[in-house]
UniProtKB/Swiss-Prot annotation:
GO cellular component annotations of the record: nucleoplasm; PeBoW complex; preribosome, large subunit precursor
Family recorded in the similarity comment: Belongs to the WD repeat WDR12/YTM1 family.
Gene3D superfamilies linked: YVTN repeat-like/Quinoprotein amine dehydrogenase
This protein's UniProt keywords: Nucleus, Repeat, Ribosome biogenesis, rRNA processing, WD repeat
SMART domains reported in the protein's UniProt record: WD40
HAMAP family reported in the protein's UniProt record: WDR12
Pfam families in alphabetical order: NLE, WD40
Record's protein name: Ribosome biogenesis protein YTM1
Organism, as annotated: Coccidioides immitis (strain RS) (Valley fever fungus)
Length: 465
């Protein structure tokens, strides 16, 4: 069968040819083991190769396919790929094929009155999905998938955040954690019923804006502009009292106000520990995805630090060349992705035994990279959000080596729908502040345009075998 295909392809043109050895990790699309290398014209591109493989498979209905050569998606002709990578046409190329990706198309936008700083999604099999947003107006909002606001948090005068909220996360189906410029971390009780979002605990300890939080079980990590990482418990019995010098100043007016509103019954607690070591604002703090006793933090001081959360001890410091603004753990690859002020994402090996700091660089953004999220379906997928007004999707298998080491370019770029067809210089007016990637809801991003934007695709990044 391979010989017939080779003859058929050769008869189409007399141009330069190359031998391709096709393989796939998708058992449903695998060619017979007897299929050997196939001689094809080097002028062929993805569509023609897809047609060829479908003919070899004798599929009833053509399956659109993508092709990876040496880990890089084929976006040109075979000849152009060979030339760009300095590969001889005499070489037999190993070509992996995967089902063609469905781009993440825009499906909905939810509008706010102010900048939207953060977003998270609650999705489970028992209830309808919920989206929670944090805004610079100091409020949390819970949305249903029909773009309706079903719950709003208390305002400042009723016991809520006293200024802009910077981050929000669902701790569980019944609890929410938020943080903000008012230097607090707050735990909220959540229900879909009438009361919605009600304050549970106010945490005091930071002396600067709390810009990012991460949650795991009954633990919270916070990253603050005061150069520290906060470590907190959601259990009142485990949480220490707040030292008086860390409580907000209580003028007669504010004292009277607290007595008149719901915050009078809200517990106030201190941190289990404040982790010190950074020499500039801390941009992100996250838990190790496989060992919640380990934490990581990134900072404007250019470093990634590893913490033992049991002893509150600094374990290791990895120093880069640029300010690091966000972090995401990729445990299957023993890597940690960090967005930078230098417009790229650096994949860092956080292990103390690692001989190099940067394992890979993801390039393409034109402004600071401030948020990251993992693909829920593929261990190779990652999305980044940037102040350039875009979110970019990466397949970390798709790489090449140049003078900067191992680098990768994004496979998709999601622009802000609010920008229309125009391109904003430096992302002006459409900066992305946060992004979440949920298996059911899709890619949810928020930002300076005061919009929750939802994009959805299918198999955006092929799964691992």
């Amino acid at each position: 069968m391979a010989e017939e295909s080779s003859l058929e392809v050769q008869s189409q043109t007399a141009q330069t040819q190359a031998r391709l050895r096709f393989s796939t990790r998708d058992e449903d699309l695998a060619l017979p083991e007897s299929t050997g290398p196939i001689l094809v014209p080097t002028g062929l591109r993805r569509y023609a190769l897809s047609t060829l493989v479908n003919n070899l498979l004798a599929t009833e209905k053509p399956v659109p396919l993508e092709f990876l050569i040496n880990g890089t998606y084929l976006r040109t002709s075979v000849d152009e790929f060979l030339t760009a990578n300095g590969i001889s046409a005499e070489t037999t190329l190993d070509v992996e094929y995967v089902r063609a990706l469905i781009p993440p198309l825009h499906v909905a936008s939810f509008l706010h009155d102010d900048w939207v700083s953060s977003v998270d999604v609650l999705s489970d099999s028992q209830n309808e999905e919920r989206i929670i947003s944090a805004s610079y107006d100091g409020l949390l909002r819970v949305w249903n998938m029909s773009s309706e606001i079903i719950h709003t948090s208390a305002s400042a005068k009723d016991g809520g955040h006293q200024s802009a909220i910077k981050c929000v996360r669902f701790l569980s189906a019944s609890q929410i954690v938020s943080s903000g410029i008012d230097r607090t971390v707050r735990l909220w009780k959540y229900t879909d019923q009438e009361k919605g979002i009600t304050p549970q605990i106010e945490y005091y300890g930071h002396k600067g804006s709390v810009d990012s939080i991460a949650v795991h079980g009954n633990r919270i990590l916070s990253a603050s502009a005061d150069h520290t990482v906060g470590f907190w418990s959601t259990k009142k019995s485990e949480s220490p009292a707040v030292p008086q010098n860390l409580l907000p100043s209580s003028s007669a007016r504010s004292s009277k106000r607290r007595k008149l509103n719901s915050s009078a019954s809200t517990s106030q607690r201190g941190p289990l520990a404040l982790l010190k070591g950074h020499t500039a604002p801390v941009s992100a703090a996250i838990f190790d995805a496989k060992d919640s006793t380990v934490g990581y933090s990134t900072s404007w001081d250019h470093s990634l630090r590893t913490w033992d959360l049991v002893t509150a001890a600094l374990v290791d410091t990895r120093t880069t060349s640029h300010s690091l603004l966000c972090a995401q753990h990729l445990p299957e690859h023993t890597l940690l992705a960090a967005g930078s002020a230098a417009r790229h994402v650096t994949l860092i090996d956080p292990r103390a035994s690692a001989t190099t700091v940067s394992a890979m660089t993801l390039r393409g953004h034109t402004n600071a990279v401030v948020c990251l999220a993992r693909d829920p379906d593929s261990t190779y997928g990652l999305i980044s959000g940037s102040h350039d007004g875009t979110s970019r999707i990466w397949d970390i298998r798709s790489t090449k080596t140049d003078t900067d080491g191992v680098v990768s370019e994004s496979i998709y770029t999601i622009a802000r729908k609010s920008a229309g067809e125009g391109k904003r210089v430096g992302g002006d007016g459409v900066k992305v502040f946060d992004v979440c990637w949920d298996k059911k809801v899709g890619i949810v991003s928020v930002g300076e345009d005061k919009v929750i934007q939802i994009n959805r695709g299918e198999g955006v990044v092929p799964k691992t075998a």
